[in-house]
Regions:
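Aromatic- and carboxylate-enriched substrate-binding clefts and catalytic-loop regions
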Residues: 354-537, 541-542, 546
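Glycan-recognition and catalytic regions of carbohydrate-active enzymes
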Residues: 109, 566-614, 651-655
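An acidic-aromatic substrate-binding cleft motif
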Residues: 258-341, 345, 349
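C-terminal beta-strand-rich structural cap/linker in extracellular carbohydrate-active enzymes
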Residues: 663-689
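Bacterial Sec-dependent N-terminal signal peptides
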Residues: 1-25
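N-terminal accessory beta-strand-rich subdomains and adjacent acidic, glycine-rich linkers
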Residues: 23-296, 658
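Conserved, mostly hydrophobic/aromatic
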Residues: 136, 342, 467, 556, ...
Length: 689
């Protein structure tokens, strides 16, 4: 596949001298967003951002504290500035769309201390039509070689007490419910302990990113980071009195610094997505565009796919991961049943969890190193036979590597484990990192684990293996650079509905996720639960949506690997299964048709390699009526639409399986009205006639 479609020439103008108090400016290509950079009287570098002449970020400072030497925050002079422009269209090997426009104006500001040390630091701003990214560059220099960062001081001073959708700044896990408050009302420390989380650490009143806000004027802004490599993850500490955020890097109990680097190096990009409506946030490509181009070349060995698997039954308690319980789920017989079902229903893969030895001692113990063996199956699971049988049926096995957060054990076995996969023709693995990180004192989002996750991706690519990571580092767009980074969890997923003591994910959860976590990248949410109440297995839990919303999630919550997560017996004979059979997983283009954060969202996606479109819409706990304008469809073309929608009496709690299915002809002149039940949704397949 040709990834680079066209690129305009880079045009650069350098200014080698400027007034130290004069604002240096760059704009977005459409001139709507402007960045002003200045030096304060104390020589601190500051920036501010405006959108259509209204401030978005007030004057905010930048800098670092370093271990054992003076900080890099003040006493700077500007020694050079460079403005440039760039415009290209590149192609995603898989993704929400094929063609991605990467068009920005760049400002590079080169600083040097006025003190005797004369240390240098550069700041690079890239301004797009959909937001701003900036990063620090530590150039090679005599007076600063090894860099030990104790804290990064990146400020985001806001213009008001915005409405915020946030989760706490947990150094270990992203599996919290989202909160909706004013910025001044954020209290992350109230979530410092949670009985359903295997690991959690919230040291500050901070939030994790992406964190999304809406101003009183209706502007939408979201803060995150891009290209997180060899650095610690960033949380944002909240100043509730002054309406401000400031970076707090994830640390380690094993070092007094948070980042160790050697110049020259760059930090991750700090990103601010800016949109006039909520849907534009989802359509933004700022995060992926700030990452380096594909370093792997041809990755056609990975095929986006739907999958079933031995997973949900463990969360329900029907079976278990280990053999000692007497209810082992990962048997040859059970796997073949899933292969047969998948082959009949246009589903390309089967995930098998609990196949390998070690599950009897995987969680709740300090001595977890050496527990898992990533090549040795349990006696009742014939790995070679299920792979052979799957190939016969056209179904690939998805490998599973739960590490129990014992990183050294996994690193020692990776070559052997990936070589086994390659020899069997298995091209994807779901990894897991449940529990506190070993070695002790490290956190899931610190530099140690950032490097572990990224090195795992690179090593796996050498064996043509793609990674779907659970308990991962946050997504920051590295799927562009390493497109074997296919999906990840990194949010409170479907499994919480099976056993969470708080009753699972409320109906507003996913209408928030679409505008927060999903801005970072693909989500392995595992939709498609048809037995919403599952009273046979659990009396106090359920999925808090209608079945129509479960179908809609295949379109709304993006991932190139989408699970049909329920038990086989809950699918068989159910006409709703046809949508899972039909729906695509790889997209030519994506359009957000409407949406408000935490309330509702409707997304349309066109399948690659066909002329078919699919539409999904979901709502929170409130019923609503939505009109869809189908003008996005091809002109002078008729489509056969199959609509799966909430029944008249549907309700996420009282009657979640009430579903109506109807067919009609649709064209780009059509408009249709859909009634969404409380916690409901609708899904549409549109096949060109």
């Amino acid at each position: 596949m040709k990834y680079l479609k066209f690129t305009t020439a880079l045009v650069t103008i350098a200014f080698f001298s400027c007034s130290q108090n004069e604002a240096i400016t760059t704009n977005s290509p459409d001139k709507n967003i402007k960045v002003d950079v200045t030096l304060s009287e104390k020589g601190a570098l500051t920036y501010k951002i405006t959108h259509k002449n209204s401030e978005v970020i007030k004057t905010s400072k930048l800098g670092f504290d370093l271990e054992g030497i003076p900080s890099l925050k003040e006493n700077f002079e500007i020694i050079n500035t460079t403005n440039s422009s760039f415009n290209e269209t590149w192609q995603m090997p898989w993704g929400e769309q094929l063609d991605v426009v990467n068009n920005y104006n760049e400002l590079k500001v080169e600083l040097q201390e006025t003190s005797a040390l004369k240390r240098k630091l550069n700041i690079v701003f890239r301004v797009y039509n959909d937001g701003v990214g900036f990063r620090y560059e530590f150039p090679e220099q005599e007076n600063l070689s090894e860099v030990l960062i104790t804290e990064e001081h990146t400020e985001f001073n806001l213009t008001g007490d915005h409405k915020v959708w946030w989760i706490p700044g947990d150094w270990d896990i992203y599996e919290h419910l989202y909160n909706t408050t004013k910025l001044s009302e954020i209290d992350a420390l109230q979530f410092a302990n949670h009985e359903n989380l295997a690991q959690t650490y919230i040291p500050n009143n901070a939030v994790n990113t992406p964190v999304t806000m809406k101003t009183e004027s209706g502007l939408h802004i979201s803060f995150h980071e891009a290209s997180l490599v060899d650095y610690s993850g960033m949380t944002l500490q909240v100043d509730t009195e002054n309406n401000a955020l400031k970076s707090v890097l994830v640390g380690s109990e094993n070092t007094s610094y948070k980042v160790k680097q050697t110049a020259p190096f760059n930090t991750p990009w700090r990103t601010i997505q800016i949109a006039e409506n909520a849907g534009e946030l989802i359509e933004s490509n700022l995060i992926v565009n700030l990452n380096e181009p594909n370093k792997l070349g041809d990755v056609s060995w990975f095929k986006p796919t739907k999958y079933t698997g031995i997973w949900w039954e463990m969360h329900l308690g029907k079976s278990s991961w280990d053999m000692a319980s007497g209810k082992h789920g990962a048997t040859t017989e059970n796997t073949k049943a899933f292969i047969d079902f998948s082959a009949k229903n246009n589903i390309g893969a089967v995930l098998v969890e609990g196949w390998n030895t070690g599950w009897e001692h995987w969680i709740g113990f300090e001595d977890r190193e050496g527990v898992f063996d990533f090549v040795t199956p349990y006696p009742d699971y014939d790995l070679e036979e299920v792979v052979r049988y799957g190939k016969e049926k056209g179904v690939e096995i998805v490998m599973h590597h739960e590490t129990s957060a014992a990183t050294e054990t996994y690193e020692k076995q990776q070559d052997t484990a990936y070589a086994l996969m390659q020899s069997l023709g298995i091209h994807s693995v779901k990894t897991g990192y449940v529990g506190k990180i070993l070695p002790k004192g490290e956190y899931h989002h610190g530099q140690y684990m950032v490097n572990h996750y990224n090195n795992t991706i690179i090593k796996a690519a050498n064996y043509q293996v793609a990674i779907n990571a659970h308990e991962p580092i946050k997504a920051t767009g590295l799927r562009r650079t390493y497109p074997n980074t296919i999906s990840r969890e990194g949010l409170r997923g479907q499994e919480f509905n099976a056993w969470a003591s708080d009753g699972g994910n409320p109906p507003e959860h996913l209408p928030i996720v679409a505008f927060t976590r999903m801005l970072a990248g693909p989500i392995d949410y595992t939709p498609g639960i048809f037995d919403i109440k599952f009273d046979k297995w659990k009396k106090d839990n359920q999925v808090n949506t209608t079945i129509a919303q479960q179908l809609a999630l295949y379109v709304v919550i993006y991932s190139p690997v989408q699970m049909a997560a329920d038990l086989i017996e809950n699918y068989e004979g159910n006409p709703a299964l046809q949508f899972i059979n039909d729906v695509g997983v790889d997209w030519q283009e994506t359009k957000v048709l409407n949406g408000e954060i935490g309330d509702f969202v409707t997304i349309a996606r066109k399948e690659r390699g066909s002329e078919n479109w699919f539409v999904g819409g979901i709502t929170d706990e409130n019923a609503r009526t939505i009109e869809i304008d189908f003008s996005f469809l091809d002109a002078e073309t008729t489509y056969e639409a199959i609509i799966y929608e909430d029944g008249r009496d549907a309700h996420w709690d009282n009657n979640p399986t009430s579903l109506a299915i109807r067919k009609l002809e649709i064209s780009n002149k059509s408009k249709e009205t859909f009634k969404l039940a409380e916690g409901g949704g609708f899904a549409i397949s549109l096949k060109r006639k």
